[in-house]
Amino acid sequence: MYPFMTLNDNTEIVHSETLDDGTVKVYIEKPDEKDCFHHMTVYLPSYKITEVTGFTDEEVKKYMDIIKSKAHLIIQFAAEGD
């Protein structure tokens, strides 16, 4: 996994290389005092969410908006192995 972005709330967004099926795994993780970490997994280019733990619906929407606005960069960096 490659680091992509750290948000002001300490949320980390990382991504895989381009996988054999042409998708890119994006993992979002945020530290939480009570639960240790909240996290979710999204696959590009379909924006398929496969796992959400600890995030509210509002947080999921916020992070998906960020992923959608930066997907072209994530896909490009994944193809380059960065």
What are these regions (language model features)?
Residues 53-82:
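Acidic, low-complexity intrinsically disordered segments
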Residues 1-15:
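Negatively charged, low-complexity tracts enriched in Asp/Glu with abundant Ser/Thr
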